[in-house]
Amino acid sequence: MQDLDIRGARVHNLKNVDAHIPRYSLTVFTGLSGSGKSSLAFDTIYAEGQRRYIETFSSYARGFLGGGLERPDVDEISGLGPVISIEQKTTNRNPRSTVGTVTEIYDFFRLLYARAGTAISYLSGSPMVRYTEEQILELLLQRYEGKKVLLLAPVVKQRKGHYKELFEQLRKKSFLTVRVDGKLREITYGMKLDRYKIHSVEVQTDKLTISEKNHDRLLASLRLTLKEGDGVMMIQEHGTNKVAYFSRHLMDPETGLSYNEPAPHNFSFNSPNGSCPRCKGLGEVRVIDLDSIIPDRSKSIYAGGILPLGKYRRSLVFALIEALCDKYEASIKAPIAKLPEDLLTEIVEGSEEDIILHEDRFAELRGVPISYDGIAALLMAQREEEDTSRETEKWMTQFTRSEVCPECHGGRLNKEALHYFIGGKNIGEVASMELTHLATWLEGLEDKLTPQQRTIATEVLKEIRTRLSFLLDVGLGYLSMNRMSASLSGGESQRIRLATQIGTQLVEVLYILDEPSIGLHQRDNVRLIHSLQKLRDLGNTVIVVEHDKDMMLEADHIIDMGPKAGRLGGEIVFSGSPKEMMRAGTLTARYISGTETIEVPNERRPLTERQLRLTGARGNNLKGIDVTLPLGTMICVAGVSGSGKSTLINETLLPILSQHLYASLKEPLPYNQIKGLEHVDKVVAVDQSPIGRTPRSNPATYTGVFTDIRSLFVGLPESKMRGYKPGRFSFNVSGGRCDTCSGNGYKKIEMNFLPDVFAPCEACHGRRYNRETLEVRFKGKSIADVLDMTINAAVEFFAHVPQILKKLQVLQDVGLGYIKLGQSSTTLSGGESQRIKLASELAKRDTGKTVYILDEPTTGLHFEDIRVLLGILNRLVDRGNTIIIIEHNLDVLKSADYIIEIGPEGGKNGGQLLFAGTPEALTKVKDSPTAPFLAEELKIAARLKKKTR
């Protein structure tokens, strides 16, 4: 197979680029943000690979794609095989998607439990048994030799009904006797039971004395009984009430409890056969939150104290509540805090007794007993209605909270599925184990199995162990199989997909990855690099778009894009081995070789009395830690993946501040106390979630600069002459937009078995607007031309429009000068989305008492971009604000005033406060996973500082 060669690539800002990528190599694409790395890797190489794949479809299938995908602007690509792209975007938002289902490890466990699990009765705790006809016959002869018995076939088990038709059918089959609710009765014509009561019915198929002489009769009766009882039969000793059960299915011989034949779908929480009937396989249920329904107990019910009901009005529900108040001799106008607790319980949860109204306004109901189910039941019933609008559902959600399902206790499965055991654990317990602990448990599992189980399980366990080892290799041992995909970060999602790909053992494939080191501690980087090398060694070519220094030094080949970003980038400034790179003069090479670095501050900001003091934080894996956050400084929260950083900051501190400042409804995770809230008057969280989920949302709309641009176009003489309003230049409302694509610029093609494809609109060719709108121009450019500009180009274009320029310059300052104003949010990486949010916040006025919370802001940033970002953040801190950054990047850690490290490991072995203090002090901590890496980084910085003096 030949090497991969690209000639004349001109996609986006690429300047007729020629590139050579050795086959079976680990190649790193690096360079400044916006220099053209992704344009070459994803928009040229991957796009052409996808196009060639589509070309293999029949002409009929391609017809649904409007003739296929557009060819990237490139002269030639040779040596291109099948391409798989693994990007850093959060996976499925579906709550049913978990780490176990995405990696398919859970599917193998379902197979394992279905084929080798030991069934235990959830009623008696005894092992379930199943018999063949021969075994049942043998047991009957052993246990009941010489005894007179009744052979009974269960036909109804604990169900309501009169069963008139059933008795008639049995009578026609010549059966004479049935056992109804434990008593024998003769079947008579027209016989029926009380339809509103629960019954158990067994038909008597024979009455005989068990002996070897009656062998043939016993066998025939046994077969008839099993046939009528659908594989189940009962034996009752004549003259007693003692019964025993026998079954061809799994059955509890003590209670008669029967299980379905185990199959993989019985262990799936996405199947009605296996899911918990209460939570439908989600593991949690929504319950009414009393504090949300009654947020202010000083208010009366009359004044709107019950939030979902609002203020008093003449309605039936208020009349019923008034009647309840009368019953307790309480007033509807009294503060809720003064109402009897029993009355409040009845108002919310419902009354056991019917209520009788005596009011004139409900004359037709006067004297009629009315059942009252309570506010909680009213809300839940409304929430579950099929025609509930999204807005109504969102409004009602504020009155509920998620709780672990009381029936399956978070196991997601029904009782039956959770009572199959292997090695003493059910599948729910296995799914909730951290992957590192799961791997340890699997090590000695064969020793706990019977020879038959071992034979069945060997191949399945081999597959599970292989896939599990790949997840551990990419640093995800702190996750569990039941962790929801929606709760994963972009980096975690990407590494899961990487581990899954290694597990497929494909060869001759070109893999393209987008910054797989995101969210990974330096300590785990070695294992990630080893995984990528393993993928290469299988016989694949691996391209990684990456800024990580260690990744570059371990690569076989490096392509450095530059020299700058956007219009000033798009060239290959270096191509060769890491050794050759060390001698190159490019910006990246200077940072790699250590001739250039991000300087360590000359002095750390002093700590003042302005502090937030959080005590007893114990959410998720946190071990009741006490943390002090000095305000007016740059604080970094470090620690290995899964140690509890996000739990502490995003799920505990942020909700506390949001509740205090904005009365947010999101509950923080458990903690004891927080002091110092008076020093904060604003909190801003900047995370990596998308700025929008449709092609309509873009940087211009998110930051608000598009409103200013539209106002500018409305003020032009041509617009005034035509009477155009701001809506004319919006692609979200009809009038000025293209009606064919409704202003999307693309048409969405559903591929069913592939991700949806967006093809350019044939009417407007992706420009979103109709011809008349595009005729209005500012400095020769239409509104579509402006949206197609990069931020850098737009800064030059609007240099003399201060209101627009200010917002654009902030986007430029955070290293986003290369993206287009109208670039669809669906094409932005998590890091880019985060920086757009950061820019949007930076453009607003800060208070000097603002707390900014950033989650890995260096995602997607080159060393030089990080230097610029740190400059912006330091400016904010210099004005008295506080920056809290969750980060692994050593350049950021060494620039912090204060570092908090959580650890020492991920998951259950994390959650402890390892250190809090300056970066220099951290390097002296022996048990810190971060200390040795930070110490080395500070040494390099100090050495370089001496040289430059």
What are these regions (language model features)?
Residues M1-R949:
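Conserved phosphate-binding elements of NTP-dependent enzyme cores
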